[in-house]
Every structure is written in C-alpha cells, then in structure tokens.
Amino acid sequence: MVQVHVAPSFQITDSLEKPTNMVARQIYLAPYSDDWAMEFAKENALLLSLIKEWAQDIQHIGSTAIPGLAAKPVIDIMIGVKSLSEADLHCVSKIQSLGYDYIQKYEVELPNRRYFQKTSPQGIRTHQIHLVEINSDIWKRHLLFRDYLRLHPAIAKEYENLKKSLAKTYSDTYEYANAKTTFIRNIEAKAQGKLNQRERRSRKY
C-alpha cells in the first residue's frame, strides 16, 4: 500500500510561526486561463532540453494546473529527480541559465526541495520550480491534491471560494498559504483514502 506521510517539506509551511526569511506580497487571483497550460508546456520543453538526463518526470502542479480554477498567475513546476545530490551537481546551474533564480535560503525550512523562481522585467514572479526527489512525500502529495481537484470540479470550486475569501482577509502570501492548510490536508487525506481503496481492490484480482 502506498502511503503519503505528512511532512514539513511541502510547499505550504506547516508552522504557524512566520519564517523570518519570507517576504510579504499582496494576493492577486486571476481567472483561469488556457495560457497557463501552454506556458507550462513551453517551460517543460526548455527544461527537458537541458536536464532530460536527470529529470525523471516534470509535472505542472498548483492551482494553475487545475482547469477552471482561479489562481495566482504563477506557473508551478515540479521536477522529479532520482537524487537531489546529483541534481545539485548537474541541474541547478542549467535551470539558472533559463532565467530562474535559485533561492537557496528556503532550504533551512525545506531541505528536501530546491526552489527556483522566474520574474518578469517588472519584478513580478511568473514561474516557480520545486525540484524534489521523485516519489518522495512532497512529490506524492502535490500530485494527490492536484489530481483530486481535477477529478472533482465541485471541490475545486470550494477551494476557489476559500482562496477568494482568504485573499480578502490576508495581506501577504505566507498568511494566505497557511490559512489554506486545513483544506489542503483534508483533500490529501481523502485522495490518499481513495488511492488505498483502489489498491486494495486491485489486490483482490
């Protein structure tokens, strides 16, 4: 049985205390755009042209990967590698060559992730990359959450309504993200339960 354990190495911080290295940003949610999937495909091709040897899989994650869902217009990309140590040697500089900044300071809180972001000429964040070991808890949890919302549009709408409400309540991204944690954890648990049921049924045949 595949189990996904709750671990602190996740995009959304589990701690209720705001890390000192996080910068406040105002929340902007854009209506869903088909351009987001096309933008991911473009970045995916660029990444594969440089790190195909080490990237075992590249996935579009986060709210921009869920059709119909309003989101912060930032393309979330997750790269799965066999080994972070190999990725440190071979992938980091290649990703930087595509215009991404490697934000190493976040590894104090998230040592099992390498984080990169790309910004527009105006300094607005447009893309972010989470480089993790494939099939790690971080990898599985991101995909469980994304796939569950893709399969359940009504739940995705609940999530959108929550995000819109929280965006009016909180003035920076950390508080906004932290306030979504309970909803996300509940969805992860439901998705894991569905996965376990399918695995139990498959073992009967």
Tell what function each PLM region has.
Residues 53, 70-74, 90, 95-97, ...:
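Short connector loops at helix/strand junctions that flank enzyme active sites
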Residues 135-205:
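Catalytic cores of NTP-dependent nucleotidyl/adenyl transfer enzymes across multiple folds
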Residues 30-47, 81-116:
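Metal-dependent nucleotidyltransferase catalytic core
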Residues 106-110, 114-129, 185-186, 190, ...:
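Expand to "…catalyze enediolate/carbanion chemistry for C-C bond making/breaking, isomerization
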Residues 4-59, 192:
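Helical scaffold of the NTase/Pol beta-like nucleotidyltransferase catalytic core
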Residues 77, 126-133:
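A short acidic-to-branched-hydrophobic micro-motif
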Residues 60, 127-130, 142:
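Histidine-centered active-site/metal-ligand motif
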Residues 46-75, 79-85, 89:
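Active-site nucleotide-donor binding segment shared across nucleotidyl transfer reactions
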